[in-house]
Amino acid sequence: MIKDKHLIDPMDFTVEELKEIFKLAHEIILDPEKFSHVCDGKILGTLFYEPSTRTRFSFEAAMMRLGGKILGFSEPNSSSASKGESLSDTIKMVSIYTDIIAMRHPKEGSAKVASLYSSVPIINAGDGGHQHPTQTLTDLLTIEMLKDGLSNHTIGICGDLKYGRTVHSLIKAMSRYKGNKFLLISPKELRIPDYIREEILRKNNIEFLEVETLEEVIDKVDILYMTRIQKERFFNEEEYLRLRDSYILNKEKMNLAKDDMIVMHPLPRVNEIACEVDYDKRAAYFKQAEYGMYARMALMAKLLGVL
């Protein structure tokens, strides 16, 4: 049973539980009106201690489309956190007023801390450079919908593999499905952390290759996952500016790729995908954002036990 569980890490749910969520997401996609009142009377608390547009809107739209309501804040200055209130006290109070909480926080591990003090399910909407499990649900649902399942894919991940929480979560999640291989494309300074390389990939005998140019591997890729170089994760602006334009996907590079490859991106993008790529049938990132709302609808319905 998924009811009343917290979602802190993409590995918190078993493969079978994920299958259950995706099955419901499929049903919602086919007939959203059928589910428009399942959360009548339910309230989602949205605690965003860090700026967000897409993730916050996606959660709010998801709850509203299920018939529920939203309480929360989109920046800490508009909450009691600006007065010095502790995270634990905020969570205790908000869980009195709401039925489920989605929280984004800049500090790694904050969602886990929140789960210790909450009387309602906590959904981690991003904790620093650590985890972003609902983006992972979005990514998995997109792959399942557009690539006929979650196994036997060659997945190219390009850009910021060091600080990108979506990247770490995606590798962990896709490593659970058989036959997946990873092509990890980044400058040396932004390679995946050692714990991902050693504890997830090597420990589980998963095939992977680290390269520095997109052109040398793009023809082998089934799923290309692009990421932006995240300015907010850098302490040194000079280093950020040097690496910002490392990888730009354009029409010329797309001409080297498979006809049935899909291009994904967690968004927002800066300049790492040229706008000309938007018109390519393989560009899946806006469809991915749409699937994110359906994934969150299914997730919240399951956690609340209404379906």
From Swiss-Prot:
Q: Which processes are annotated in GO (biological process)? A: 'de novo' pyrimidine nucleobase biosynthetic process; 'de novo' UMP biosynthetic process; amino acid metabolic process
Which Pfam families does the annotation name? OTCace, OTCace_N
- Reaction catalyzed: carbamoyl phosphate + L-aspartate = N-carbamoyl-L-aspartate + phosphate + H(+)
The entry's keywords: Pyrimidine biosynthesis, Transferase
Entry binding sites for carbamoyl phosphate: R54, T55, R104, H132, Q135, L267, P268
Which principal EC class is assigned to this enzyme? Answer: transferase
Q: Where does L-aspartate bind?
A: K83, R165, R228
The family annotation for this protein states: Belongs to the aspartate/ornithine carbamoyltransferase superfamily. ATCase family.
Q: Which HAMAP family match?
A: Asp_carb_tr
Q: What does this protein do?
A: Catalyzes the condensation of carbamoyl phosphate and aspartate to form carbamoyl aspartate and inorganic phosphate, the committed step in the de novo pyrimidine nucleotide biosynthesis pathway.
User: What name does the UniProt record give this protein?
Assistant: Aspartate carbamoyltransferase catalytic subunit
Source species: Clostridium botulinum (strain Alaska E43 / Type E3)
Organism lineage: Bacteria, Bacillati, Bacillota, Clostridia, Eubacteriales
